[in-house]
Amino acid sequence: MVSVNDLKTGLTIKTSDGMIWQVLEFQHVKPGKGAAFVRTKMRNIRNGNIQEMTFRGGERVERAHIERNKMQYLYPMGETYVFMDTESYEQLELTTAQVEAALPFLLENMEVQIAIYNGEVLGIELPNTIVMTIVEAEPGVKGDTASNVKKNATVETGHIIHVPLFIEAGEKVTVDTRTGDFTGRYNG
């Protein structure tokens, strides 16, 4: 058990209803009248929903110890996706529902972290930035540079991202997997 006064960003807790949450933001509030409390913004680990929660000062919550295993994505197999533990070489099959949030950025042979709680796979954590190849890009209109104009481009997974006008098909770019935003050209 951990006091809500000791909550930190990134900490995972288990609430009384059995749900597992990760702390995204927290704020200790001490009003002029009444008792102090902690206002938090939390992300549900199982479904990704974000919710604000308020706890009374001094309240205790159960800490959820989440195991993170380094695995390599191998290939899709029907309705499942096959991953391999990089240390033991054991293979693990995950369903589409378990990897759905990561699918737009999941590339074969990519190393990912698999989050596991009490033997239950909670989801996949991708690297923060990855290198992807643009397979199709809308043509940029010359002279249309009055502001920070972007165009649609399709990456190798079929996902569409917004890129600057100068990016063409065949180029490698870096993408932030948390937001899906273009972060720059890849110079590797």
UniProtKB/Swiss-Prot annotation:
One of its GO terms (biological process) is peptide biosynthetic process. It is found in: Cytoplasm. One of its GO terms (molecular function) is translation elongation factor activity. It comes from the Bacteria. One of its GO terms (cellular component) is cytoplasm. CDD domains: S1_EF-P_repeat_1, S1_EF-P_repeat_2. InterPro entries: Elong-fact-P_C, NA-bd_OB-fold, Rib_uL2_dom2, Transl_elong_fac_P/YeiP, Transl_elong_KOW-like, Transl_elong_P/YeiP_cen, Transl_elong_P/YeiP_CS, Transl_elongation_fac_P. Keywords: Cytoplasm, Elongation factor, Protein biosynthesis. It holds the Pfam family Elong-fact-P_C. Pathway: Protein biosynthesis; polypeptide chain elongation. Signal peptide: none annotated. Belongs to the elongation factor P family. NCBIfam families: efp (TIGR00038), PRK00529.1 (NF001810). Involved in peptide bond synthesis. Stimulates efficient translation and peptide-bond synthesis on native or reconstituted 70S ribosomes in vitro. Probably functions indirectly by altering the affinity of the ribosome for aminoacyl-tRNA, thus increasing their reactivity as acceptors for peptidyl transferase. HAMAP family: EF_P. This is Elongation factor P. It comes from Exiguobacterium sibiricum (strain DSM 17290 / CCUG 55495 / CIP 109462 / JCM 13490 / 255-15). The gene is efp.
